[in-house]
Amino acid sequence: MSTRKILICGATSFVAKGFKELLIQEGFDVDTFGRKDGNYLEIDKNPMLADSYEAVVNFAVLKDQSIEDNVSYMKSLVEMCRQKHVKKLIYFSSIMVYSYHLGKLDENSPIDTVANTMMEGYGKIKIACDEFLNSIKQSFPFEVVMVRPGYVLADNRPAPFIKRLPCGVSVILGNKKSRQPIVKREDVHLALLKIIEADKNLPVYHLFQNNDITKYNFAKQTVGGLILVLPKFIFEGLPRLMMKMGMMKKALYSRFDGMYNYNVASSTMTESKLNIKFK
């Protein structure tokens, strides 16, 4: 029986750290691809890759390049998957592809669009790549699986919405209703392993705790002490007014808007399908 071969793109990223080792431990033969191995935009032409792969797991994002470059990378990645007879492409997306104003969202919820979003940078790149893959995936001879995690924690990485101050005081970027789904890196890796091994996957998986915890309650549980919040009418209302008056760019306003994300996000279908419980 031949060894099952996996390609990891972006294997040196924070989220991918340790994933190669897990796959090897589970009996897979693993190749990795990063910037030192060649041009992402021409990955389909890279002669160093194997003749075939069972699955490709993509963590890579070209953060310092344009949206167009990132979509071009997706085109090259898809072509490489065709050439290498890949059975499934697992694309690491983000919960940032959703509008902050859906109210409730699950694995079937529509994503935001490049035309509609006020975000720039990472979030907009992820939306653009998701849009591209969704627009043509029906023509692929392989399975495309979108993985949308919350904020990934590991190695004592602090939650980005908690700012520690002296004397046991912390400030959260938001108010008591604000939410930010989170997930442990080890749980991300376990879910990806299950996705690789599954005969048939959901089109989209949500990787984050299914407990609807608010930023405020998360801060109380993890850092304790005195937790201060930022009033929405000041820290979202004033920037919104400035944006409407042409004094603030939409992309900058979207950062304030995101601080008051009240979406109730569910990973119920993911936990059921993969028989996993995000902790």
Task: Please state what every model-predicted region is.
Residues 102-147, 151:
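Catalytic helix-loop patch of NAD(P)-dependent Rossmann-fold dehydrogenases
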Residues 137-181, 185:
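NAD(P)-dependent short-chain dehydrogenase/reductase
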Residues 4-26:
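N-terminal Rossmann NAD(P)H-binding glycine-rich loop of SDR-like oxidoreductase domains
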Residues 76-121:
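Conserved Rossmann-fold NAD(P)-dependent oxidoreductase catalytic core, especially the SDR/UDP-sugar
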Residues 42-83, 98:
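NAD(P)H-binding glycine-rich loop region in Rossmannoid oxidoreductase-like domains
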Residues 191-250:
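Mid/C-terminal beta-alpha module of Rossmann-like enzyme folds, strongest
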Residues 127, 140-143, 152-163, 194-205, ...:
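Glycine/proline-rich active-site loop of Rossmann-fold NAD(P)-dependent oxidoreductases
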Residues 213, 227-229, 248-279:
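C-terminal amphipathic/interface module of NAD(P)-dependent oxidoreductases
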